[in-house]
Amino acid sequence: MPNNMEQENIQDNMQEMEAPLVQMQGVDVMNDDNLILSDVNITINKGEFVYLLGKVGSGKSSIIKTLIAELPLQKGAATVADFDLWKIKTSRIPFLRRKLGVVFQDFQLLMDRSVEDNLLFVLEATGWKKRGEMIARANEVLTMVGMQTKAHKMPHQLSGGEQQRVAIARALLNNPPVILADEPTGNLDEDTAADIMNLFMKIHAQYQPAVLMVTHNRELYKRYPGRVLICENGGVREMEQEIYFEI
């Protein structure tokens, strides 16, 4: 039987293990002085896959920008990967972003660099020093997304789906506990979008990150399991499963 001190340590460890990877409590999402969303409450735990829906201009992307500290927190409380967004200093924001895998709709690859050099650029920017280890890690994540034979291609030589796979590989470089994906299939045709979603689901099943995916594509959350949040009327609410399968 554990003594009292050991029991307290066990409870503390359990609390740490169970701490949400993404949490927003009573947050007002602001863009300059404009109130976008009010009283936002979101909790995402390790291993959860959560969709964030809403019309254009409803505030979905502003939530992502708040979570990566691009938009400052002005009201409420928020933590991401153990970083307190209320207290975070500008000098600490790069360390926060190393814990986040961010995937955008438009890929945002460096068009004048090869696939491998795109990844090496990120590794160097996030503190990696040894080139051999950097190349090995780049090859590892490219293999994870099925792009290991494309390392020396230039982005313009790749299809849209292939560019998005590289963007996902880039997001995985530092083993992030949280993945934030902003319309990652928005520029892709239906078949390519399905391939990318299957890749996301494979990564999620294997590594169990917390995933928040912004999308307007209702077919995604019908075909692939996950919680569903919706931005509407200046707030965020959770959709019941039986409702969103009927939409």
What are these regions (language model features)?
Residues 68:
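Helix-to-loop junction immediately C-terminal to a conserved catalytic motif
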Residues 76-84:
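Conserved ABC transporter NBD signature motif
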Residues 154-164:
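Conserved ABC ATPase signature
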Residues 179-182:
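Catalytic Walker B motif of ABC-type/P-loop ATPase nucleotide-binding domains
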Residues 85-101:
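ABC ATPase NBD coupling module
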Residues 112-121:
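Short coil-to-helix segment of the ABC ATPase nucleotide-binding domain corresponding to the Q-loop/switch region
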Residues 173-177:
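A short, proline-enriched helix->beta-strand linker immediately N-terminal to the Walker B motif
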